[in-house]
């Protein structure tokens, strides 16, 4: 899918999820989340072509303009909505599925490593499709959050969360088991 189509999808996703988003033009001109996703697409393309320094510069400019820090190596799905995005941090090896929703202050980070050798490989979370992450939530390490799960505001997730579950608390515990099929 080309970038203009992705941008249109991003804008439409914000309009569907944010009752304060009145028009596509307003979202395009004023949404830090949409802006950060656009910058990330450029940075990620540069990263994949191994223009690492330029990718990091683009990523830094995005953070400066939007307050949202997305590492250029992160993999983001379609129609991600970052609502009130100030302070959102998404690490290098994070993977985010389609149709996810993040509120402000969300961190997809790595755990503290004992040595540099431990920093090689997968260090950040993987989120399935349709995951909602509440304000101030922190998800650390190479954990998996299943499709349709919700991470409550201010929760700290250190273990895998099954699909459809609600994770709540510090450290987060599953409060609602996934629905039986």
Where are these regions (language model features)?
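Terminal amphipathic alpha-helical/low-complexity segments used for targeting or macromolecular assembly
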Residues: 1-66, 181
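Residue-level signal for alpha-helical context at structural boundaries
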Residues: 25, 29, 60-61, 94, ...
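Solvent-exposed, flexible loop/coil residues
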Residues: 32-33, 38-41, 74, 80, ...
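Ubiquitous "structural anchor" signal
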Residues: 41, 99, 117-118, 177
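Left-handed beta-helix
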Residues: 66, 71-72, 77-78, 83-92, ...
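Regulatory activation segment
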Residues: 115-124
């Amino acid at each position: 899918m080309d970038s203009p189509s992705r941008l249109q999808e991003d804008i439409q996703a914000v309009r569907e999820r944010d009752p304060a988003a009145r028009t596509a033009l307003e979202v395009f001109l004023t949404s830090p989340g949409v802006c950060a996703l656009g910058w990330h697409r450029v940075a990620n393309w540069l990263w994949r072509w191994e223009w690492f320094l330029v990718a990091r510069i683009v990523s830094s400019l995005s953070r400066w303009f939007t307050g949202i820090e997305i590492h250029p190596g992160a993999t983001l799905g379609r129609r991600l909505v970052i609502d009130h995005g100030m302070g959102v941090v998404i690490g290098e090896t994070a993977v985010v599925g389609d149709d996810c929703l993040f509120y402000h202050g969300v961190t997809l980070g790595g755990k503290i490593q004992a040595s540099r050798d431990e920093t090689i490989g997968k260090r950040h979370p993987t989120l399935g499709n349709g995951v909602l992450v509440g304000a101030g939530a922190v998800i650390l390490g190479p954990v998996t959050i299943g499709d349709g799960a919700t991470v409550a505001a201010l929760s700290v997730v250190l273990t895998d969360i099954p699909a459809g579950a609600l994770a709540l608390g510090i450290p987060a515990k599953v409060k609602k088991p996934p629905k039986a099929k």
